Amino acid sequence: MLVDLRMRSAALGALFCTMALAAPAAAIELPTAQARAELLDTLEREALYRDRVDWPEMRARLSAAQGNPEKIRDVLKEAIGRSSGGHGAWLSVERMRSEATRSGRATAPAAITASDATAAAQSPALDPRIGQVEIGGFSVVPGPAVVQQMQERAARWQAIIRDQDTGKRCGWIVDLRGNTGGNMWPMLLGMAPLLRITKEGEETVGSFATAKDPSPWRSTPSGMRLGTRVIVDLGTPGYRLKHPGVPVAVLTGPRTASAGEATVLALRGRPQTRSFGEPTAGVSTANVVRPLVDGSALVLTTSVMRDRNGRGDGLKITPDQHTRSDAATVAAAQAWLLAQPACAGR
């Protein structure tokens, strides 16, 4: 996930935060020699887990690999992987173009697959007193419409919540099991009606922790900020639940990654909130994008995500209640919600 807030870097970091350095066997793409040196220098200076790498040895191996594209690629991949905990990446110019195009197509609603339909059929029917919203992965496409894309997606998620909020809901399920990452900010703003517990003012819902002071994620009635900087804002106050502060059950799984894990952490520590399912992917760290001299880019992992209480280690997030199957996870979440005082007797 993203710390650097310049729009192009932000867009690229959100887009590629879960990708690893890889190349087709037929054509190995590599940074230029100058860019390779810059890449290693940047990793040694700024990467979150830079102390895990013997940098003189890594440079010696890179030098010995000259003339062998496969070995060069493998050395760079190892340097990035070890110093980022598996969350960083090198992106060629061509790959940035192709992935931006692919991501643009991927923002359309996905068709329901046979496996999705089977899982839905096996899940228990929800009690009508419980609302549900699925916050899936979402990446913005680099360009001048980045802010608009974030606003539109956040507004869409808030509308899903609003349309279910008849006044009879005594609890909600936030399903993050399929959230493989992307841009966390529209996710947090989209679920703000459930995330926020106050009507006015700012709420700190998490942070990025670096060697310096933490950078807090702040939810306002209309948007999201990183520290004092506005990341995305709807322009007017977003939707507010008819019964604010109701119990929320959070569903997680091994596909919940990166921005998805940021969303889990934002909800963790919220009053009347409990998580169910399986541990997350384990990349709850934040990325920035650093352009290199040849036009390619380094997705650089620089900080750890933490919840509103300062808890977080960059590793897998374990749910409060471990459940394995989709049906068992939904059933456990529903049982807990219905046992809460907000639902009792309603």
Where are the language model's segments positioned?
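N-terminal secretory signal peptides that target proteins for export/translocation
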Residues: M1-M7
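Hydrophobic alpha-helical segments, especially transmembrane helices
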Residues: M7-S9, A37
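A broad, low-specificity signal marking well-ordered, structured residues that form hydrophobic/aromatic
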Residues: S9, I130-G131, T273, L298
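Bacterial N-terminal signal peptides
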Residues: A11-A20
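Terminal targeting/pro-maturation regions of precursor/exported proteins
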Residues: A26-I173, R177-G178, G345-R346
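C-terminal "post-core" interaction segments
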Residues: E29-A47, G136-S139, G167, L176-R346
